[in-house]
Amino acid sequence: QYQLLTKKGVVGKLPFTEVEHLDRENVRVVFQGVEGAYSQAAMKAFFGDQINSFHVKQWRDALGAISEGMADFAVLPIENSTAGFVSEIYDLLLKYDDYIVGEQIIRIEHKLLGCPGAKLEDIKSVYSHEQALMQCEQYLNKHRNWTQTALENTAGAAKKVAMDQDKTQAAIASAIAGETFGLEILDENICENDVNSTRFIIVSNQRIFEKNAKKISICFELPHHSGSLYNILSHFIYNNLNMSKIESRPLPGRNWEYRFFVDFEGNLNDSAVKNAIRGITEEAANMKILGNY
């Protein structure tokens, strides 16, 4: 089968266009959250300061903004080294005709923030994003009398505490968020993982990839029968491609059937990549190239 793929040649014209470099100046970039969010830090690390940026309340709003032409790029968290992948982002990538064109990894350094004059013993309630609460689980387990409430964003939690001016409230967010909203750091070492990092993806509505892109993300659906996943993974093995990640999400309304998300090394111009994608397309359902970056 794999010899046949090679004899037939590789996939024909790709639906993606190669570009020398992504535009990183004078572009419109959207991130989810408020000023001081980790997404904003990732945006600045990737694009710099010569951009026009704005923020939205939810992740789907960010993808909607680029789909509607309000922004050129969106910055979204996709995976954390402690809490794992962000499942909702994977689902949203399928609902919108948007594509990954870059990634940025930043270190996450959570702080416990409170109103000026507040003390650790004053705290009764703590607010943050659900991922941040998970990342600080061991610390929070030492304070079981605290009520935990998940909000849409870590910086949004800092903003709430600042607006309420209640010394019994605290937020888990970055030091930058604390400075932005005038909060004080009540405790610093609150994350059990000293190298806690989050990978953010840069998303566009353009099917483009940089000439030196070296990672590809795809997704596909498989029937629930013996050997189906093994057969798909064989395309990576026989084309000598290094798969760096695989995740699965249940298919709505189809018990015990899954959609798989795979990251592997390569460039869409590589013959081995084209052969593998062709083989996967023939065996899997609803295969989509999410991006090459």
Q: What is the predicted role of each segment?
A:
Residues 1-293:
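Domain-level signature for soluble enzymes in the chorismate/prephenate branch of the shikimate pathway
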